[in-house]
Amino acid sequence: MGKLFGTDGIRGIAGQTLTAELAFHVGQAVAAVLTEEKGSRPLITIGKDTRISSDMLEAALMAGICSVGGDVMPLGTIPTPAVAFLTVQQQADAGIVISASHNPYAYNGIKVFNAQGYKLSDEMEGRVEDLILNHAELPAAVDGAVGRRHHGMHALHSAYIRHLLGSIDCDLTGLRVLVDCANGAASATAPDLFRALPLQADFI
């Protein structure tokens, strides 16, 4: 286990131990390592949960990635497995999840997936950590080399919902379900998923 990355990414109290500045440097370091590996501009997906600090951390990560020439594909509020799926489906070079799972609301976290949708290897995490902890001065992208933000979030959500629908192999006709997304990470996609099923869904 590294100094920043624990067993499930980087976690801390948002604004204290997990600051916007740290998120910016994580974005820079991830993009720089991927650029070195790939030899060209990387594409990184970013998904988040609904914690109040997620928008701040997303903006900082995106700024860090773009500042060293990486492109970003924001996925918005979406479950962690969706980030892994869409990273692979969109042929991105990595995916980042902003979430602290079961931790109290004041916490947040940054988890990085590789191009195959799996947890970043210890070796790659170590390289990212080294750049951050050694305060490496990464060359800034200028002019046309600055990274860009990709659009089309709604279409990406739809692609994930189609994937989920394709995994259902039982008859749901006639069921009535009550759905409480509890303002969680699935709250932006679950309603469309249930409405596409042959059942009656009521939402809280």
Regions found by a protein language model. Give the residues of each.
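An N-terminal, well-structured beta->alpha segment
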Residues: 1-63, 67-68, 149-175
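General beta-strand structural signal in soluble alpha/beta enzymes
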Residues: 5-6, 46, 72-77, 97-98, ...
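Short, electropositive, low-hydrophobicity segments enriched in small/polar residues
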Residues: 10-20, 51, 80, 99, ...
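Gly/Ser/Thr-enriched, mixed-charge loops and adjacent short helices
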Residues: 13, 108-204
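Ferredoxin-reductase
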Residues: 31, 38-116
